[in-house]
């Protein structure tokens, strides 16, 4: 499995980094207790943190909006923004709720009741791979995408497309506008076995991207009992080929 990124994307966005996890021969159709437990745990942690800080992850989401703008995308939301918006809506939490006008004033942490935490599991399950991906976005506040690599022969490419960038699997478009507007090509379904996971970030959250990559690699290996491989793209490193 291979991914290549147009060097101009790294020129356009200084400090851009992409953590990679490759997984081979995963069974994404069967019930997976580890994936389900991880999704639930991430939901509970996010709910607890949102009770204490309703503006949780807003700084990171704004940074990703700036990345989209730098990449030429004028409209659209990133995957991590969509996940947080969906989760907040399901919990009935507003990002502006309880935020002090003076940033120097620290709010007294709110206490979450057992009943409130019992409703944490609001983010609906999809399939084991996507449950781990979506849980990872709630946990680390980073942009994570997974692509079905089919028979592993067709490379995944992030190409320059006019003023913006697109994600392509061979001659098919996965994402018309990089990081948003998902298409059908490369979509992860119950039949998916071989995947490339991309965790995208920048200089300011580089450590979170690395932490998310390492944890997702560990979770995928444990949940599916299959071989995984990790990679990293940054600066002049614009290609990665998995050996598994």
PLM feature spans:
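Charge-biased, low-complexity intrinsically disordered regions
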Residues: 1-244
């Amino acid at each position: 499995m291979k991914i290549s990124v147009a060097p101009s994307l790294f020129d356009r966005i200084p400090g851009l980094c992409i953590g990679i996890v490759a997984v081979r021969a995963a069974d994404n159709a069967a019930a997976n207790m580890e994936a389900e437990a991880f999704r639930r745990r991430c939901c509970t942690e996010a709910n607890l943190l949102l009770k204490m800080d309703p503006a949780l992850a807003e700084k990171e989401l704004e940074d990703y909006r700036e990345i989209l703008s730098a990449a030429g995308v004028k409209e659209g939301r990133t995957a991590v923004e969509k996940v947080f918006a969906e989760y907040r809506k399901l919990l009935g939490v507003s990002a502006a709720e309880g935020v002090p006008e003076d940033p120097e004033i620290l709010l007294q942490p709110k206490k979450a009741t057992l009943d409130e935490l019992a409703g944490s599991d609001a983010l609906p399950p999809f399939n084991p791979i996507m449950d781990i991906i979506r849980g990872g976005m709630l946990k680390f506040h980073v942009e994570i995408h997974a692509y079905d690599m089919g028979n592993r022969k067709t490379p995944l490419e992030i190409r320059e497309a006019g003023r913006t960038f697109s994600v392509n699997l061979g001659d098919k478009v996965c994402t018309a506008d990089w990081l948003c507007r998902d298409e059908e090509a490369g979509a992860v379904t119950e039949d998916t076995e071989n995947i490339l996971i991309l965790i995208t970030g920048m200089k300011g959250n580089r450590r979170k991207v690395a932490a998310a990559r390492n944890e997702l690699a560990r979770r995928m290996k444990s949940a599916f009992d299959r071989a995984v491989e990790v990679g990293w793209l940054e600066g002049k490193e614009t290609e990665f080929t998995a050996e598994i």
